[in-house]
């Protein structure tokens, strides 16, 4: 999964929101979190049904679940897991400002989900992409970018004054990646997320 590209796109969202004073959120439907969760579970079941075997690795901690199986990687972190991430950030991030950024960023997040399905069969990837695209159709498209022909679309619900953004979904069908931040984030912090992405990622490993 090309995480760097996705986080760069997220930083671009911050720049976009900073320049906009109004939002079209009122005429857009909200992201259907339940449907997206259901689609990911369907993807896992279909990957198992394909019979493509790969070494299964899993890690389950309070509020954190990481599963790698059938050429599919799923990371699901709930509210309790977010608390552990904050603790990990405190240990691994030495710069005080970066630490404040990381903790403030995750303050409003209720769930973080990362799905990497780029190694699944082409048929399965395309089917999942169609389902996700239909689910996101009509939601607020905050940013769409292309790099070397590969598209990244970012959806969410912005407040009318553009200061907050809820339920961010980063969808990169060509890369086989789906990242969801369920909850509400201060839009001003999004660019800082991109800048601190590597340090925040390291905090998860230190849990």
Task: Identify the function of each model-found stretch.
Residues 1-8:
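Bacterial N-terminal signal peptides that target proteins for export
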Residues 28, 32-127:
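Early exported N-terminus immediately downstream of N-terminal targeting peptides
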Residues 105, 148-151, 178-179:
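Small-residue-enriched, tightly packed secondary-structure blocks
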Residues 18-19, 23-25, 49:
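Boundary at the C-terminal end of the N-terminal hydrophobic targeting segment
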Residues 9-18:
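Bacterial N-terminal signal peptides
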Residues 155-190:
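A short, solvent-exposed beta-edge/loop patch
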Residues 184-207:
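C-terminal partner/receptor-binding element of secreted or periplasmic proteins
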Residues 129-159, 205-207:
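Short Gly/Thr-rich strand-loop-strand
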């Amino acid at each position: 999964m090309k995480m760097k590209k996705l986080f760069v796109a997220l930083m671009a969202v911050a720049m976009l929101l900073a320049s906009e004073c109004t939002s079209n959120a009122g005429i857009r439907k909200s992201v259907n979190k339940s449907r997206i969760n259901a689609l990911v579970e369907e993807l896992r079941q279909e990957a198992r049904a394909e019979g493509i075997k790969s070494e299964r690795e899993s890690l389950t901690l309070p509020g954190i679940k990481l599963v790698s199986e059938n050429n599919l990687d799923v990371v699901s972190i709930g509210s309790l897991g977010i608390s552990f991430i904050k603790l990990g950030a405190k240990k691994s991030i030495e710069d005080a400002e970066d630490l404040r950024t990381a903790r403030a960023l995750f303050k409003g997040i209720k769930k973080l989900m990362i799905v990497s399905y780029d190694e699944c069969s082409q048929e399965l990837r395309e089917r999942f992409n169609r389902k996700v695209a239909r689910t996101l159709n009509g939601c607020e498209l905050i940013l769409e970018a292309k790099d070397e022909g590969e598209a990244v679309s970012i959806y969410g619900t912005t407040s009318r004054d553009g200061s907050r953004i809820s339920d961010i979904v980063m969808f990169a069908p060509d890369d086989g990646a789906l990242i969801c931040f369920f909850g509400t984030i201060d839009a001003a912090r999004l660019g800082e997320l991109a800048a601190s992405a590597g340090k925040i990622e390291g905090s998860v490993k230190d849990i």
